[in-house]
């Protein structure tokens, strides 16, 4: 179920949102960020397991995750689903459809979530007053493409244990950017969803979590994970730790 929430005059806007350092305003001068307040006029609340948008829906907006988290996924002709991304607060969902002018994936809430609706006509309108906005969205699209390419490289070139380690380190970095703990967080996605994303079976993911626990790399209790040995995880994927 979706529930649309019109913004009240005292609601948090882009210029006062605590996610501004990772969302649309990231890197923009303060005087320009104030003009972004005109971009978002409503929010949508999406219950866990419900869809924000479907594959091939016309693209009339992109969405900034305000709280909660979502997954994006594709479905092939046989009905098999492939998860293409997990999206945390401050991240923009739907950018991958801007070239085709339609959504190229479906977006589903992993938990009760709320997103800011950024309608494309509003982007065009505000861009006439703020020419740098179009460039900002190109940067955001570039960030999304880079993330997708990194994921393809991870799945294509790494062993199974390296894929899971890279996934956990990626979440660690993203939570740190939000100002949360980089070593303790809750996995909002199931192990089966992690496996689907990484190209691993559920059994392999479960086995690797157990192995990482035995080796002292992590401590996990159901979906609560603590990264105990960050240097060890980085070494596993061939990164030098500082």
Swiss-Prot record:
Record keywords: DNA-binding, Transcription, Transcription regulation
GO molecular function: DNA binding; DNA-binding transcription factor activity
GO CC aspect terms: cytosol
The UniProt record lists the keyword DNA-binding: yes
Ranges of residues in domain HTH crp-type: 158-231
InterPro entries to which the protein is assigned, alphabetical: cNMP-bd_dom (IPR000595), cNMP-bd_dom_sf (IPR018490), Env_Response_Regulators (IPR050397), HTH_CRP (IPR012318), RmlC-like_jellyroll (IPR014710), Tscrpt_reg_HTH_Crp-type_CS (IPR018335), WH-like_DNA-bd_sf (IPR036388), WH_DNA-bd_sf (IPR036390)
DNA-binding residue intervals: 191-210
Function noted in UniProt: May regulate gene expression in response to changes in oxygen levels or to changes in the redox potential of the bacterial environment.
Protein name from the UniProt record: Transcriptional regulatory protein btr
Lineage: Bacteria, Pseudomonadati, Pseudomonadota, Betaproteobacteria, Burkholderiales
Gene: btr
């Amino acid at each position: 179920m979706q529930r649309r929430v019109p913004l009240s005059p005292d609601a948090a806007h882009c210029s006062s949102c605590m996610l501004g350092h990772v969302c649309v305003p990231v890197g923009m001068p303060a005087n320009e960020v104030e003009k972004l307040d005109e971009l978002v006029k409503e929010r949508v609340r999406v219950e866990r397991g419900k869809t924000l948008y479907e594959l091939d829906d016309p693209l009339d907006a992109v969405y900034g995750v305000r709280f909660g988290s979502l997954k994006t996924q594709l479905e092939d002709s046989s009905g098999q689903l492939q998860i293409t991304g997990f999206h945390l607060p401050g991240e923009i969902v739907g950018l991958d459809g801007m070239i085709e002018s339609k959504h190229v994936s479906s977006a589903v809430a992993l938990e009760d979530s709320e997103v800011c609706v950024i309608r494309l006509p509003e982007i065009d309108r505000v861009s006439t007053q703020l020419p740098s906005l179009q460039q900002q969205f190109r940067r955001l699209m570039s960030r999304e493409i880079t993330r997708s390419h990194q994921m393809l490289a991870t799945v294509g070139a790494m062993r199974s244990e390296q894929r899971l380690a890279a996934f956990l380190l990626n979440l660690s970095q993203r939570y740190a950017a939000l100002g949360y703990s980089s070593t303790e967080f809750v996995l909002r996605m199931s192990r089966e969803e992690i496996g689907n994303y990484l190209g691993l079976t559920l059994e392999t993911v479960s086995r690797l979590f157990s192995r990482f626990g035995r080796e002292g790399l992590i401590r996990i209790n159901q979906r609560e994970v603590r990264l105990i040995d960050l240097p060890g995880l980085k070494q596993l994927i061939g990164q030098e730790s500082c």
